[in-house]
């Protein structure tokens, strides 16, 4: 079986790339799972990029117009008049993108595991049958623990965390607001989030440990017995190099195209999918990584902010919350906040002279990590 492009991994990003390429190229998608979905993923995507990327409206479960940020002892909220982000049904998103790709001519191999490369071909296995798929280009969109990345000898420098998310039945009347909790007494690895699906169901999660998530549930006055679904997964914050080698490219989580501040990877991966399509059209994968330069800068910036977060104790976080909850800071955030571009939001804050001066009095480390 010979194709122009074989995509290994039929998640949201792999299926999005298949949709971009199908109709123009002969495309195969090799997916190990027998059905879509299943990954621990809150599935929150910035509204602007959701529309820009032409993602399926039928996958949207809820719309968010604002967020409430909590520290141990204080809080502030950011609100806009229009939806800033959408929560999606991951399975519905992946399936809808696959359906689009198939209608345009892509061929899917579900329940088919990629074993490695043999004589320039992809060796795969479906149940007890082993066979080969040949292509001019191969794309590894097979997640953080990418087998394709291992096969091409990609080097990884990253921090890996386990993520845990539960769906909880409760009272979530402010269903258009996401809650973000920053409390190192509960979890010193990451923040906790509450993202309502509707007024009676929410996705609640964190990265680090399941025990930290259970501690947070108790703080939020919710019980473990209100959980109706538990999911777990892994994430990597850092760099995996190279993103392309010969006729093989890495995309999405496989390339660690992941936001270090929120662990979201869908948008970065899909934006890089456009760069990869251009590279495939040119027949030259060597230009792919350069075309994703802005995404790489965003990841590098996010890694610096994450280092700062890890270096701060809770007392300094409380003092920074005092600054962020000021009307001056909220005005800046509401004016410049971009759900998918954290660098834009944070840069706007540190470029504000009075806010920067106050923050530097709390932690001079800002100069090392953010002011460049």
Residue ranges with predicted function:
Residues 1-11:
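Beta1/beta-strand and adjacent pyrophosphate-binding region of the FAD-binding site
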Residues 6-8, 19-40:
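Glycine-rich FAD pyrophosphate-binding loop
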Residues 47-96:
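A conserved beta-strand/loop capping segment in the N-terminal third of enzymes
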Residues 114, 207-279, 286-291:
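FAD/FMN-dependent oxidoreductases across multiple families
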Residues 316-372:
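C-terminal auxiliary extensions adjacent to catalytic cores
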